[in-house]
Amino acid sequence: MSQCPLCHSWDVHRIHTSSERLGSREFFLCSVCDLVHVPARYHLDNDAEKARYLLHNNDPADPEYRKFLSRLWNVVRAELSSGAQGLDFGSGPGPALVHMATEDGFDILPYDPYFAPDQSVLESRFDFITCTETAEHFSSPGTEFKQLHSLLKAGGILGVMTSMSADWSQFPNWHYNRDPTHIAYYSRRTLEWVSDSLHMEVDFPTANVAIFRKPSEVR
């Protein structure tokens, strides 16, 4: 049995065992928060994980990649005031969203444990945080979402983009489970659980995008 890394419940059950060329993995669904996770024994080591990320085509100049990121950025940008300061959490080897936000006149810093690992960045507080195609790599999503919440100023917004499942019975056929760096999988119900646990509001303005809002007066 494997404890849920989001809500820490033991009420989980295995929904799939893969047999990909990179090795077999087990996937467990939590009955409490609806997260599917891969147990730690199947996680890649740091060197293998970083090498996998370097295979991604995240060129900041790629118009198709920018179009992809704009699904989240356009929603976040529409809610920002002039002078808003932001953080791109999990910025990756090609921090395209940092380039896009900077071009739109916003101050934004990158943070990534492999590619922009300056921990001093995490000592600040931000008006907005973007987290694109990163949450699926969280090994301890309960801890990591709490960290994101703590990095937001009161009244701030957190934009998360990750593929979400509408039907876990289809999980074995979902291409998303084939990437060995993907170890946490979400539904809307999962992210609603996150928002409730952190006393935030959340809505889903477009496919695979969640916008969390921290109250102006923190409860």
Positions of predicted regions on the chain:
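Helix-to-beta-strand junctions that scaffold the AdoMet/dcAdoMet cofactor pocket
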Residues: F138-S139, L152-A154
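Conserved N-terminal segment of class I S-adenosyl-L-methionine
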Residues: M1-F128, T132, F145-K146, M161, ...
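A short SAM/SAH-binding and catalytic strip from SAM-dependent methyltransferases
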Residues: T130-S140
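Short acidic, glycine/proline-rich loop/turn micro-motifs
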Residues: Q170-W174
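Short "lid" loop at the C-terminus of a central beta-strand within the Rossmann-like core
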Residues: S163-W168, A184
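Active-site micro-motifs of SAM-dependent methyltransferase domains
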Residues: F115, E136, S165
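Conserved beta-strand signature within the Rossmann-like core of class I S-adenosyl-L-methionine
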Residues: G155-S163
